[in-house]
Every structure is written in C-alpha cells, then in structure tokens.
Curated annotation (Swiss-Prot):
L-serine binds at residues 229-231, 283, 383. PANTHER family: SERINE--TRNA LIGASE (PTHR43697:SF1), SERYL-TRNA SYNTHETASE (PTHR43697). Homodimer. The tRNA molecule binds across the dimer. This is Serine--tRNA ligase. Gene3D superfamilies: Bira Bifunctional Protein, Domain 2, Serine-tRNA synthetase, tRNA binding domain. The keyword rRNA processing does not apply. Belongs to the class-II aminoacyl-tRNA synthetase family. Type-1 seryl-tRNA synthetase subfamily. One of its GO terms (cellular component) is cytoplasm. It comes from Thermomicrobium roseum (strain ATCC 27502 / DSM 5159 / P-2). Catalyzes the attachment of serine to tRNA(Ser). Is also able to aminoacylate tRNA(Sec) with serine, to form the misacylated tRNA L-seryl-tRNA(Sec), which will be further converted into selenocysteinyl-tRNA(Sec).
C-alpha cells in the first residue's frame, strides 16, 4: 500500500509512475475521498469541542428555558456528530479499499518498458552444455524412465496435476532439503514451517488480495485460502507487530507446496510440468531497515544464484522493466535457467524488493532505537528455488546418451550416494521384490 500522503502531496509523480507501469488506479476518487475525510475530521472535532463547551455551560445554568434550550441544542449536536461519524467510517472504508487497488511504484532505476520485451538481461553464468546426441525435453525423459505419471495425476485432480514417481520424487525431496540446508547453514536464514492455509488478512497483507483472488484456491466456509507461495504466511508472521530495536535484519526460509489456478491460454505449456496448479518452492523472506533494502536485494539475488551455481546449471539474471513488474514489487530480478530439451529459459526464481508496500498493508513496523517512533520495515522475498522447473532443468541438462539422468554432485549425499536415475519400477514391483526376499529368507531358514 502506498503512503496516502505521497498520493496527496505528489499526485503527478504517482500518475507518471502508473503510466510507466502501463496500469491505472482510482487516484481521482482517492483524492476526493481524502479531501472529504479531512473535512469531516475537522468538522467532527469542531462539533465535539462545541459540545464539550456547551456541556460545561449547562452545569452552570439554572433550571429554566435557557437550560432546556441548551440541552436540546446538545442533543442536536450529538445527532449531527453521530451522522458525520457514520459518513466518516464509510469514507474511510471505501478509501482503504481503493488504496488496496494501487500498485507499488517502480524504483527510479527500473528500466521503462511496455512488457516483458523491455526486460534487461543483466548477466549470464555458465555455458550451455554441448550434447553429441539428440536432446530430449523433460516430458519425454519422464515418460521413457517412468518418472512422472501424467495420466493418473489428471485422473486424480484434473489437468495440470501430475504424480512424481520413484527417484524423481526422491530427487525433489533431496533438492528441497539441500537448498534449505544451504540457506540455513551458509546464507544465514532461519527455517520456518508455516501454515499452508491463511486468513484473508494475510493475503491482503502481501498484496495477493483483492486483486488476484481469481488465481487463488479458497474455502468459502472457513474463508481460508491455500497459499500461492510461502511468502504469504512467512511475511505475515509479524503482521500488526512492532519489532524491537536491534532485531533487523530478519532472514527466514520455508519450503512449502504452492497452489495456483494458473489460468493460461489454451494450448500453452500443455506438455510436462512447467506450468501446474500445485508445486513445491523454497522461499526466502527478509525484513530489513529501509536504508539497507537495496543492498539486501542484491544479497538475496546472490543467495539464489549460489544455488544454481552449485547445481552447475547455466542461467541468466534478468531485471524486470516497469511493464513487467509485479503488483507489489518496486524492483525485481528473475533468475532463468537454460533448458536444452525444450530450448527455452525457465524462470526458477523471482527476487523482489517491496520497500514498505507490504509492511503498510500488513502493519509491520520496527523501532530504530529505544523510545523511537515506530517505522515501517522493508520486506523482500525470493525463490530459492522453485520446483518443478528446477527439476526440469536438472533432467534436461544432466541427461545422458543412454537415456539416464545424472544426479548433480551436490545432491548425491542426499540421495544415498546414488549417481544416476534410470528406468523406474512399476508400482507393484518394490512390494513384489520385498515378498520375494522374505520368501527367500524363509526358505533359507
């Protein structure tokens, strides 16, 4: 949420920023309501002062017509104040609702552009691996090795759901555990395990509501919402709190499933697991002092890059232009990894600085020092990293001529030393193998 004073005192600046974002917001109505609200506040305060003065005067008047007239005037004042209070409450409610519709403003150094075509590639790391055999996309590898059961995922839950099988399910677990350990042990984050269902207030705090309700899963009976990212519950840990002096920065990391309706054009990304309704993600969230948030954004990007470098996956860092910024971000960098099978760059991390936009919505403040006036924190978040796209990148970059998939070296300790993923057994084969072993042991005895 923007500071109302910024809109009031610099409306042209806000309008110009919205123009760069290629979006609109109800600024005129906000300004009109703000002016009326200020008039009402002044009028109510004046009437209350008048009522207090008349109340003291009544105590000094003897019984008689003048006293009765003053009492009647007092009642009229009370009725007027009550009516104005009702109007003021309605205006404040409407004003708050309108302010929630205004996006964050881009930082001055964000490239200006109409859409993703205006994004700027900041740097590359690594070279795409040369292959001397035909490279397959991840969905072909998955089908040939029995790693993903697409048909049964659809049968269970509908389109864009899937079932990971065997070593790929294990690789996902290993990847999540390794990323969490890296962020905790080397990057200075504290792991948290938050709820996957949140209240409406939490979604409003991070900017997901009211604008993006159509993309969220919602239980109407309880008014609980399935999280689209761990950013929502983790950011709201400190909603309506004042953090004590010396408590910033705070670095938190969480691994959660994410749920999104992901309404996309028919025929787009229909193969594989690139765009799905349920996926896992490791999320980094920061609460920092305002004068440190620029530096902290660069550190956040570096933490996400470290994951990709250790996985030895070629990637690029892309700065979002004004036309491709999210609703809540003042500045955002995406990390895109190269997928040689599908011949495309896949976004596996978005790292954003929200400034005080989320903190105002969620009322998250801190005291710079003892006795100091509370200020809004700055919040940041970034994927570190998102699955299944990181799985896609591993499958396609580490595929071998014999059709197997090499396991990245950093993940092998989390896979019991396993080095490659091959053809997976049928659903019933592990149980049959156990039975055969038990029968063999029984025969030996």
């Amino acid at each position: 949420m923007l500071d109302l004073r910024l809109i009031r005192e610099h409306p042209d600046l806000v309008r110009e920023a919205l123009r760069k974002l290629n979006t609109e917001a109800p600024l005129d109505e906000i300004l009109e309501l703000d002016e009326r609200r200020r008039q009402l506040v002044a009028e109510v305060e004046q009437l209350k002062a008048q009522r207090n003065a008349e109340s003291k005067r009544i105590g000094q008047l003897p019984a008689g017509p003048e006293r009765e007239a003053t009492i009647a005037a007092m009642r009229a004042l009370g009725d007027r104040i009550e009516a104005l209070d009702r109007e003021l409450a309605a205006i404040e409610e409407r004003l708050q609702a309108l302010l929630l519709e205004v996006p964050n403003l881009p930082d001055p150094d964000v490239p200006v552009g109409p859409d993703e075509s205006g994004n700027v590639v900041v740097r590359h790391w690594g070279e795409p691996r040369p292959f001397d055999f035909p490279v397959k996309p991840h969905w072909e590898l998955a089908e040939e090795l029995g790693l993903i059961d697409f048909a049964r995922g659809v049968k269970i839950a509908g389109s864009r759901f899937y079932v990971l099988r065997g070593d790929l399910a294990r690789l996902q677990r290993a990847l999540i555990a390794w990323m969490i350990d890296l962020h905790v042990n080397e990057h200075g984050y504290l792991e948290v395990y938050p709820p996957f269902l949140v209240r409406r207030e939490a979604m409003i705090g991070t900017g997901n509501l009211p604008k993006f309700g159509d993309n969220l899963y919602h239980d109407e009976e309880t008014d609980l919402w399935l999280i689209p990212t761990a950013e929502v519950p983790v950011t709201n840990l400190f909603r309506d709190e004042i953090l004590p002096p010396g408590s910033l920065p705070i670095y938190l990391v969480a691994a959660t499933p994410c749920f999104r309706k992901e309404r996309v054009s028919a025929g787009r990304d229909v193969r594989g697991i690139k765009r799905v309704h349920q996926f896992e993600k490791v999320e980094m969230v920061k609460f920092v002092e305002p004068d440190r948030s620029d530096e902290e954004l660069q550190r956040l990007v570096a933490d996400a890059e470290d994951v990709l470098r250790r996985l030895e996956l070629p990637y690029r860092v892309v700065q979002m232009c004004t036309g491709d910024l999210s609703f809540t971000a003042a500045k955002k960098f995406d990390l895109e990894v190269w997928a040689p099978g599908s011949q495309e760059w896949l976004e596996v991390s978005s790292c954003s600085n929200f400034r005080d936009f989320q903190a105002r919505r969620a009322n998250i403040r801190y005291r710079p020092s003892e006795g100091a006036r509370p200020q809004f924190v700055h919040t940041l978040n970034g994927s570190g990293l998102a699955l299944p796209r990181t799985l896609i990148a591993i499958m396609e970059n580490y595929q071998q001529p014999d059709g197997t998939i090499e396991i990245p070296a950093v993940l092998r300790p989390y896979m019991g030393g396993q080095q490659r993923i091959g053809r997976q057994p049928a659903y019933w084969e592990p149980a049959q193998a156990r039975r055969a072993r038990e029968q063999a042991r029984a025969g030996d005895s």
